[in-house]
């Protein structure tokens, strides 16, 4: 079967890899000159299934009001007056209750855990190198309330069979030695020892090379104008004067998926702006060993080989990609507070990107009302974490193979009135990755 994939970020390239492995003839189209040059370029570097959780959570509306008056707030909103922004925010607010939070987190953890199995199998099969580490993730708490509130997430982790360790402040240095100097600022942490880290852009570039060797065609520097429709099917993709035809089509356009699908499929995918710093390491003993996540500021600090990646924050500001100095100051403040001697912050590279976010936090992976159109988008801040699992899942659905995980509640149909998931089993109902 011929398959055209729109988008060469980590999700699009992973989709291409698994579809090619399944025997399909795959073409990837992207406006950039190479893979992973937008949202996948400089993210926080975490592969953290256990921390897969929606931003829409109980208490977030009240916190958002408080954050409006804080200098280093993890979330900021700038109203643009568009009906889409207001509608998306309203849908997100409706998900900010315990029932929806637990349902959405369960879906996200299910896909994220499966995705980690997939990337592990991919590593074993190909030997792909991307400055990856399997040292776990440590969530840091600065208040006693945060420490005690971890019980809610621990319940989900236990249901999903995810190993964890709840650590007091005095135990943090056993996981992250450099934190010994700042333990007095912290109340404890939640470690997930099975989580991983790695350079998402490097991974995507290397996987694109492997996919090309497997027969995938990459067409760069081509802007997609529109999808052509005949009846209940897509008949082609128009890029300027060129039209590309296939048997099936995959939209992995990230935040730009919504606009491309306008008048065809309604999806609530909105750009959530984030930032990162990439800092050269000057003292390895004073740098992080793996990844820490500052719960107060929602900032992740990740170790690559000779670099530290500091990433996070969320701005609901539309497609604004301007670098804001005050956001850099927040990233610098957090890394200097926790790892003051790890690297030269003044030499850091500052970056921003748009994460494709759904109001319930769960990505949209699967079929649409158009028979040969599939979606793989809306992964929010977890595109790197979920990419391989989403790619394998999508390949199975297109190939007519029963997926290894329940997936009916991951598709766009869940936004339809009256939708009820067929899946009612435990979160860890996962078959081994192929």
Swiss-Prot record:
Cross-referenced InterPro entries: DadA (IPR023080), FAD-dep_OxRdtase (IPR006076), FAD/NAD-bd_sf (IPR036188)
Cofactor: FAD
Known EC number: 1.4.99.-
Keywords: FAD, Flavoprotein, Oxidoreductase
Pathway connected to this protein: Amino-acid degradation; D-alanine degradation; NH(3) and pyruvate from D-alanine: step 1/1
Superkingdom of origin organism: Bacteria
Binding-site list for FAD: 3-17
GO MF annotation list: D-amino-acid dehydrogenase activity
GO cellular component, one term: cytoplasm
Enzyme class, first EC level, given as a word: oxidoreductase
Reaction(s) catalysed by this chain's protein: a D-alpha-amino acid + A + H2O = a 2-oxocarboxylate + AH2 + NH4(+)
GO BP: D-alanine catabolic process
Function: Oxidative deamination of D-amino acids.
HAMAP family: DadA (MF_01202)
Family, as annotated: Belongs to the DadA oxidoreductase family.
Entry-linked NCBIfam families: PRK00711.1
PANTHER family reported for this sequence: D-AMINO ACID DEHYDROGENASE (PTHR13847:SF280), SARCOSINE DEHYDROGENASE-RELATED (PTHR13847)
Protein name: D-amino acid dehydrogenase
């Amino acid at each position: 079967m011929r398959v055209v994939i729109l988008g060469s970020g980590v999700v699009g390239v992973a989709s291409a890899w698994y579809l090619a492995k399944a025997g399909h003839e795959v073409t990837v189209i992207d406006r950039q000159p190479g893979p992973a040059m937008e949202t996948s370029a400089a993210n926080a570097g975490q592969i953290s299934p256990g921390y897969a959780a929606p931003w829409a959570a109980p208490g977030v509306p009240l916190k958002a009001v408080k954050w409006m008056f804080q200098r280093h707030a993890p979330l900021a909103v700038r109203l643009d007056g568009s009906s889409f922004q207001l509608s998306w925010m309203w849908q997100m607010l409706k998900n900010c209750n315990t029932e929806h939070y637990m349902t959405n987190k369960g879906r996200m953890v299910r896909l994220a855990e499966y995705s980690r199995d997939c990337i592990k199998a991919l590593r074993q099969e190909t030997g792909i190198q991307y400055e990856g580490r399997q040292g776990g993730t440590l969530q840091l708490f600065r208040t006693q309330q945060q420490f005690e509130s971890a019980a809610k997430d621990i319940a989900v982790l236990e249901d999903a069979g995810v190993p964890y360790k709840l650590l007091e402040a005095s135990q943090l240095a056993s996981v992250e030695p450099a934190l010994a100097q700042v333990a007095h600022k912290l109340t404890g942490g939640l470690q997930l020892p099975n989580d991983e880290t790695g350079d998402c852009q490097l991974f995507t570039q290397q996987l694109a090379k492997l996919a090309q060797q497997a027969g995938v065609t990459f067409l760069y520097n081509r802007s997609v104008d529109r999808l052509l429709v005949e009846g209940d099917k897509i008949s082609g993709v128009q890029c300027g004067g060129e039209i590309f035809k296939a048997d099936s089509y995959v939209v992995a356009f990230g935040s730009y998926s919504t606009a491309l699908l306008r008048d065809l499929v309604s999806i609530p995918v909105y750009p959530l702006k984030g930032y990162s710093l990439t800092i050269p390491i000057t003292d390895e003993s004073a740098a992080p060993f793996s990844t820490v996540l500052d719960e107060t500021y929602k900032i992740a600090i990740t170790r690559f080989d000779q670099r530290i990646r500091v990433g996070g924050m969320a701005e609901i500001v539309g497609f604004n990609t301007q670098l804001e100095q005050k956001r850099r100051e927040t990233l610098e403040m957090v890394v200097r507070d926790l790892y003051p001697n790890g690297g030269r912050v003044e030499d850091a590279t500052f970056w921003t990107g748009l994460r494709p976010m759904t109001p319930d936090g769960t990505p949209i992976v699967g079929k649409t009302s158009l028979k040969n159109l599939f979606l793989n988008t809306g992964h929010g801040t977890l595109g790197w974490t979920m990419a391989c699992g989403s790619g394998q899942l999508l390949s199975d659905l297109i190939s007519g193979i029963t997926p290894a995980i329940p997936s009916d509640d991951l598709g766009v149909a869940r936004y339809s009135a009256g939708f009820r998931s067929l899946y009612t089993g435990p979160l860890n109902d996962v078959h081994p990755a192929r």
